Amino acid sequence: MKVILLEPLENLGDVGQVVDVKPGYARNYLLPRGLAVLATESNLKALEARIRAQAKRLAERKAEAERLKKILENLTLTIPVRAGETKIYGSVTAKDIAEALSRQHGVTIDPKRLALEKPIKELGEYVLTYKPHPEVPIQLKVSVVAQE
């Protein structure tokens, strides 16, 4: 029996693959759990349409990431914080950086995609990587300065 996988399964394949399985396995395990659908002509057409739509969305996201890269790589984000000699009071997190970028330059980013291993706790210049798309990493320059 041919089925279209809706979830990646270790022994069968990835999402969207058409695989041939035993009828009992399909009827008793894959279909009731929503892991696969029968490979009918209408389901195959729906799968093709979904694949085309997903490819279009990925291309749009990549184009948006390229546009964002042109904007972000040419600027340095300055974040003023309360500080002593070199240490700051508190820390600067990815969320703080995203808010400052939105406030100062009107650019909105997802803080979860900003590679910041631990919060910034000292004054200085930092180069962070932002990944809005897996193929488009962006180097963002951040300057943490003492508030006057």
Swiss-Prot record:
<dbReference type="GO" id="GO:0019843">
    <property type="term" value="F:rRNA binding"/>
</dbReference>
<dbReference type="InterPro" id="IPR009027">
    <property type="entry name" value="Ribosomal_bL9/RNase_H1_N"/>
</dbReference>
<dbReference type="InterPro" id="IPR020069">
    <property type="entry name" value="Ribosomal_bL9_C"/>
</dbReference>
<comment type="function">
    <text>Binds to the 23S rRNA.</text>
</comment>
<dbReference type="Pfam" id="PF01281">
    <property type="entry name" value="Ribosomal_L9_N"/>
</dbReference>
<dbReference type="GO" id="GO:0003735">
    <property type="term" value="F:structural constituent of ribosome"/>
</dbReference>
<dbReference type="InterPro" id="IPR020070">
    <property type="entry name" value="Ribosomal_bL9_N"/>
</dbReference>
<dbReference type="InterPro" id="IPR036791">
    <property type="entry name" value="Ribosomal_bL9_C_sf"/>
</dbReference>
<dbReference type="GO" id="GO:1990904">
    <property type="term" value="C:ribonucleoprotein complex"/>
</dbReference>
<dbReference type="GO" id="GO:0006412">
    <property type="term" value="P:translation"/>
</dbReference>
<comment type="similarity">
    <text>Belongs to the bacterial ribosomal protein bL9 family.</text>
</comment>
<keyword id="KW-0694">RNA-binding</keyword>
<dbReference type="InterPro" id="IPR000244">
    <property type="entry name" value="Ribosomal_bL9"/>
</dbReference>
<keyword id="KW-0687">Ribonucleoprotein</keyword>
<protein>
    <recommendedName>
        <fullName>Large ribosomal subunit protein bL9</fullName>
    </recommendedName>
</protein>
<dbReference type="GO" id="GO:0005840">
    <property type="term" value="C:ribosome"/>
</dbReference>
<dbReference type="InterPro" id="IPR036935">
    <property type="entry name" value="Ribosomal_bL9_N_sf"/>
</dbReference>
<keyword id="KW-0689">Ribosomal protein</keyword>
<dbReference type="Pfam" id="PF03948">
    <property type="entry name" value="Ribosomal_L9_C"/>
</dbReference>
<dbReference type="InterPro" id="IPR020594">
    <property type="entry name" value="Ribosomal_bL9_bac/chp"/>
</dbReference>
<keyword id="KW-0699">rRNA-binding</keyword>
